[in-house]
Curated annotation (Swiss-Prot):
InterPro entries listed in its UniProt record: MnmA-like, MnmA-like_C, MnmA-like_central, MnmA-like_central_sf, Rossmann-like_a/b/a_fold, tRNA_2-thiouridylase_MnmA
Record protein name field: tRNA-specific 2-thiouridylase MnmA 2
Functional note: Catalyzes the 2-thiolation of uridine at the wobble position (U34) of tRNA, leading to the formation of s(2)U34.
Any one GO cellular component localisation term in the record: cytoplasm
Catalysis performed (reactions): S-sulfanyl-L-cysteinyl-[protein] + uridine(34) in tRNA + AH2 + ATP = 2-thiouridine(34) in tRNA + L-cysteinyl-[protein] + A + AMP + diphosphate + H(+)
Disulphide-bonded residues: C97-C192
Active site residues per record: C97 (nucleophile), C192 (cysteine persulfide intermediate)
Annotated EC: 2.8.1.13
Amino acid sequence: MDIAALLSGGVDSSVVVHLLCEQGYKPTLFYIKIGMDGAEYMDCSAEEDIELSTAIARRYGLALEVVDLHREYWDNVAAYAIEKIRKGQTPNPDVMCNKLIKFGCFEQQVGKDFDLTATGHYATTLQLGGKTWLGTAKDPIKDQTDFLAQIDYLQVSKLLFPIGGLMKHEVREIALRAGLPSARRKDSQGICFLGKINYNDFVRRFLGEKEGAVIEFETGKKIGTHRGYWFHTIGQRKGLGLGGGPWFVVKKDIQDNIIYVSHGYDAEQQYGYEFRMKDFNFITDNPWEGSTGEEEVTFKIRHTPEFIKGRLLHDEEGYRIISSEKLQGIAPGQFGVIYDAESRVCFGSGEIG
């Protein structure tokens, strides 16, 4: 079996290679190069990633190829993020990177020549009813199925997640025992294409700054200024520069560039328990095809370890969720990710409208 393994230079993908080799496979290794336009945004972490990936390849006597998808990334993902931010929405570039780049452009250019593509994602695949489904990871804190919830059946059927059945500390222990060069490397944080680049610097480069008012939601009183609504997201608490906190962003007026904040964030009053999703993507199949009733599900609206219980309803306008608990910071542009009631199978996701 021919396996392509995606390396990032981190401990997770390094352990993937180790486990595959232990099982007798000789995967071909690939490092996908993405990044920002402009020399001032060059990030030295990419060079370190390639060095560590090269060390892993040499360690196991495997071929490593660097695949440059910088232009494809910019055209498909970075531009998507900027457009969402411009509209006052909250993008999820990691979701789109997986869908369009790692398992999209890479598959079209390289992965098509292999039987499977192995990655260091914390996820699993399940065989149910003769079909492949995306399953959650053993480690609920590291589970990354919400970042994979826009892929399609062709993509999920070719994916292999060797560490999906392990806890993070077990992955570290394997790396330490094997003496892998990335064993003690810290996990990456933040948006996949930014590396060590500050998020606000990235937004500022493309959208600039424009001063606007910060207004207390309950009183209508101006309590400060901001440098552009695009720097702020619904539910944001940090980085507002206001005294007497905590303050939370509860509303944005895109037309007039106004940020509304609340001192005592009342999620129930602001949002209730319900949200709609548009353009819902079922990864494998719609398990409720033809059903007109309510379905008991669990879901996520952001990358957190917790799965929230709720009811999924379908009508002429699409799908909506009624949550079992009040929700904080529902952000248009993000994805509502739907799972079965036991949080074992990830069925897919839709953009929160």
